A protein has these predicted regions:
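Active-site mouth loops of central-metabolism enzymes
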Residues: 25-38, 93-108, 133
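Beta/alpha (TIM)-barrel catalytic core signal, keyed to glycine-rich beta->alpha loops juxtaposed to Asp/Glu
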Residues: 131-248
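Active-site groove signature of glycoside hydrolases
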Residues: 115-134
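Short, acidic/polar
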Residues: 34-47, 102-118, 160-168
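N-terminal binding-site loop/beta-alpha segment at the start of enzyme catalytic domains
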Residues: 1-81
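A short, structured active-site edge motif that brings together acidic residues
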Residues: 80-92
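Conserved, mostly hydrophobic/aromatic
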Residues: 10, 22, 40, 47, ...
Length: 248
């Protein structure tokens, strides 16, 4: 492990991770502007060289392309990576307001697709990407437990900022992790969610630590984002944009 990176246990999972992880939403190439595959692979190599072991992706990032790139990067060195991915939004039925996985069998088949794209036989942390009380929550939970028993996932959790949903998801105390948006601009989880996670032994995975780039010191009121970057909405919707600008 890198001498300057720090590592810590991920809650009660028994998994040790680098304190800084690499999120791979942008690697999908369909939400943060155009990305080049070789650039993504070089970035992953750079992260590894600097002690990063934790990599987070999802089936919906680039419609699976982000997972495929991570799988390519892991070839021949799977043991260097702690892989977290997600399931739920891919093929989501907006009219019914539920995921495509209405049976445990369908859900397990969905995770098998994650495994195939990642080119691995196990996932370290498998997460529900659904962040509200989806009718199929119980399907996800049973599926996660079966997959864990089969050795195809080491731990499971949920990505949500909804405290009531988190408690429902963890009603049996078997959930391992929570992924949540948290930064110096968004500290609302300090009131209820983070104390709950500490009490329950949940590993907390922070997303949005630099607030989608706002805290990187690169943006001004005149910044405009390119085609394919969802942040274009910030200046297309002045009211939303002002919410961000006031915190710069």
């Amino acid at each position: 492990m890198n001498g300057t990176m720090r590592y810590r246990p991920l809650g009660k999972t028994g998994i040790t991770v680098s304190e800084i992880g690499m999120g791979l939403w942008a690697a999908g190439g369909d939400a943060w502007g155009k990305t080049e595959d070789q650039e993504v692979l070089r970035a992953i190599d750079y992260a590894l060289d600097h002690g990063v072991t934790f990599f987070d992706t999802a089936d919906v990032y680039g419609n699976g392309h982000s997972e495929e790139l991570l799988g390519k990067a892991m070839a021949g060195r799977r043991d260097k990576f702690i892989v977290a991915t997600k399931i739920g939004w891919r093929n989501f039925d907006g009219e019914k307001g539920q995921s495509a996985y209405t049976t445990v069998e369908a859900f397990i088949a969905g995770v098998e697709s994650n495994l195939k794209r990642l080119n691995t036989d196990y996932i370290d942390v498998m997460q529900s990407h659904i962040d509200f009380r989806d009718p199929t929550m119980e399907v996800f939970l049973e599926g996660f437990q079966r997959l864990k028993q089969a050795g195809k996932i080491r731990a499971y959790g949920v990505s949500t900022s909804n405290f009531e949903y988190l408690k429902a998801f963890n009603h049996d105390g078997k959930t391992n992790t929570l992924q949540i948006d948290y930064s110096i601009l968004n500290r609302t989880s300090e009131k209820d969610i983070l104390p709950y996670c500490q009490k329950q032994g949940l590993g907390v995975i922070i997303r949005g630590a630099i607030a989608m780039g706002i805290l990187a010191g690169k943006f001004t009121a005149d910044t405009r984002f390119g085609e394919g970057d969802f942040r274009r909405r910030w200046h297309e919707n002045p009211e939303e944009y002002q919410v961000f600008l006031k915190d710069l």
